[in-house]
Amino acid sequence: MASTAETIEFPGLDKPDGLSIRYAFSVSLFFEERVIIDSPSQRAFVPPMGGEVWGPRLNGRVVPYSGADYGTVTGLDASYAIEAEDGALIYVMQRGFMKRLDGGTFWTAGAPRTPGELPRQSFADAANTPVPMRVRPAPLFDAPVGPHDWLGRTIIIGHAQRHSGPDHTLFTYYEVL
């Protein structure tokens, strides 16, 4: 297999003719607090407080507290709802991968807790700074029949940038054509 920065050849396999992507929309998700399960994967429970959706293919808002991110330090595992500007409710099931690029930690240690109190932790990064990481989401959508049902028939891929203070993530999504 020969490879350069511009091309990758796979002997015996056909190239995917006409494969391209087109910007579809962006989503900002805002979070208030994170509950971290103290395990090797550092699984979190993080409900979205809300957010916005904008772009050429979809506009609206993230329904506050409509789901949660149950991700780990390396994976996305979130479900939440979007309310489109026409009032349609769209279910989002987001999976994907993320990797911290600077070797830093994701969370600061929470204060000591008493039995029955949930462990809460916050971002380890300074306020109002992008978190240096690579995020690759691949969401699935369940939308009602009508102007948004294209979401259920389209492969969507994206990238994201996490920010601290306020704690939020900005997702940018593309439809695979």
What are these model-derived regions, one by one?
Residues A2-L177:
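Beta-strand-enriched cores of mature, soluble protein domains
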